[in-house]
């Protein structure tokens, strides 16, 4: 793991939830989706039997209606926290560089809106781990 957020309490049993996310930085803007929680990177939870790359393809199609080109793995972060419904929770997030492609269908998640967020507004991302991952990606350029 490249970065761990939070502190693991050895007395607790955490529910792991792996996910995979795309980082597309183009012309000083970041590909994002906006939903009721706020701005997020395209991606989400990995389903049983699904590769990280397949997860990104599926989630991007569901959230944006667009195809993607996925590059090499960039970084990973996990977080030890208390989820308001799930209790002890450990989301494990894998980040990949890539590019959002053309729209091929309407998004199947109607509460998600695709947009390009100016990098100057990076702090608007809802998930701190995603802010860290984008900054890490920028350092690698």
Regions found by a protein language model. Name each.
Residues 1, 74-75:
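Local beta-strand/beta-hairpin segments that build beta-sheet-rich folds
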Residues 40-44:
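A short gly/proline-enriched turn/hairpin at secondary-structure junctions
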